[in-house]
Amino acid sequence: MISTTETIQLLKNSLPVQGRILAIDWGTKCVGLAMSDETRLVASPLSTYLRQNVQKDLTYLSKQIQEWQICSVIFGLPIHMSGDMSGLALQVVGFSKKLEPIIYPIPIYFYDERWTTQAVERQMIAADLSRKRRAQIVDKLAACYLLQGILDAL
């Protein structure tokens, strides 16, 4: 696993000059999506997708990538505090390997997403959102939080 600083440097060196970036917050039940504007200043929540099966998940994501003319995909990688890969992180990597040939030549990157969901949860609680509403939007907001952090670092 490369460091956050190294990932940002890799993105700076390899991303096309312009174009939308899609961030994916992969969960066991839901997938949160967020995308940047074409100039990469602002991240916006896109959708929360209820996972079904690998084939349907691949189809959904590839359609989103095509529809929004995405130039790069970044998966949040849920790794342990020790830096070791979690079981979910291994699932993310495995799924990305299936997505890669479908969306080629669009590159896929990974970014350490430790604490993103918790940070978003705290913000939603502070905003006094109900538990039900938080559950509906947490995944896409976590993806947005992740992506905005990346955009700010670029």
Predicted regions and their residues:
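Phosphate- and other anionic-substrate recognition elements at nucleic-acid/protein interfaces
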Residues: M1-L22, K29-L154
